Amino acid sequence: MNRHIVPALALAAACTTVGACSTNQDTEDNPATGVSASPTVDKGPVDPHTTVVDDTAAPQGYSMDSINQMIQDQEAENPGINQDMVSMAQEVTADPAECAALTPTGVTYISKIVQNPDAIAARDFTNESTDATLSVAVSSDPQLLNHPRDVSVCESITRAHAGGSTSYTAAPMELRVDGADSVTAAEVTLTQSSSPLSGDNGSVSRIAYVEIDGATYTVSGSPEVAPEEFTRMVQAQAEKIRQR
């Protein structure tokens, strides 16, 4: 496999999480939901490529990789490899099926970008000394980052792929994002895997899905990411969208 695929495949480890805490914005702040109300201003369509966070949001010790650029580079070096990634993504399944978006893999995001290059942009932030990875994706099409709003259906998840299967348990994570229309956040624990590449049993990663100001974005953090680094990235992406 092309070496350029490695940063994107970190998304697989970073995105082994399940969402909870979902809500819609009301006319007043609601601390229980993680959403606070703000005036709605029509700023026009969201351009994911200009609103996704850049290297200025990287935590100390982290470097950034553009998944969109990586996809272009690897196709130039190995024509057809991106279509192979799309095919691989189609082989990954989840049970329950609606929870697939809550345990995405690197090829999941590559597939979405290859097929919808203008509608989604993604970045990886990696700390090579700790193997910690934060992954961020922003889309102008909410269907590309569709996710279940009720974590109860995703309490137990099994993800199957050509190399075997991986099982997880999910728990709600409290997360507040000012101005968001919807926040879904959770911690997911790896309980069993047929592949050592999936991580260690008992390892906990985090994921959030946020709908705000006409955009939908997701942030995921591998088990090595500190909780405060994960939260700061979620807030940084919200701020970037609000200020566009």
Task: Name each region found by the language model.
Residues 1-8:
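Bacterial N-terminal signal peptides that target proteins for export
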Residues 64, 68-199, 203, 236:
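A small/polar (G/S/T-enriched), proline-flanked helix-loop surface module common
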Residues 22-25:
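Bacterial signal peptide processing site
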Residues 57, 179-183, 209-217:
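Short, solvent-exposed coil/turn segments at beta-strand boundaries
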Residues 134-136, 210-223:
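Short, well-ordered beta-strand elements
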Residues 219-244:
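Surface-exposed amphipathic alpha-helical segments
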Residues 17-20:
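C-terminal motif of bacterial Sec signal peptides marking the signal peptidase cleavage site
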Residues 30-63:
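N-terminal low-complexity, Pro/Thr/Ser-rich intrinsically disordered segments
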